[in-house]
């Protein structure tokens, strides 16, 4: 199960890297200076739509956040997120 979560986090990271265009340095500094923009929600679903053993209630919706300061109380670090040239911590619960 941990392998599946890690693999899903890496796939999400790959999609995010491909989706985000490379930003100029000026735009990155503006992003860094804006408070409250540090957390981004990501929803992960496991299994196929027909149903499988992986679609248990606890694994159906894994909510992940890209955080700058580390994970919160009930979250675990599952990798990293990248937006432009900035690297964040991927925290899931």
From Swiss-Prot:
Propeptide at: 20-58
Keyword Chloroplast attached: no
Write one Pfam family the protein is assigned to: Defensin_1
How far does the signal peptide extend, from start to end residue? 1-19
Where in the cell is the protein located?
A: Secreted
Q: Which family does it belong to?
A: Belongs to the alpha-defensin family.
Output this protein's name: Alpha-defensin 23
């Amino acid at each position: 199960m941990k392998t599946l979560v890690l693999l899903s986090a890496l796939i999400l990271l790959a999609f995010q890297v491909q989706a985000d265009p490379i930003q100029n340095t000026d735009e990155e500094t503006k992003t860094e200076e804006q408070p409250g923009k540090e957390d981004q929600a990501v929803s992960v679903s496991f299994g196929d739509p027909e149903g499988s053993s992986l679609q248990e209630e606890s694994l159906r919706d894994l909510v992940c956040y890209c955080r700058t300061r580390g994970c919160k109380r009930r979250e675990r670090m599952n990798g990293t997120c990248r937006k432009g040239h900035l690297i964040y911590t991927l925290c899931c619960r």
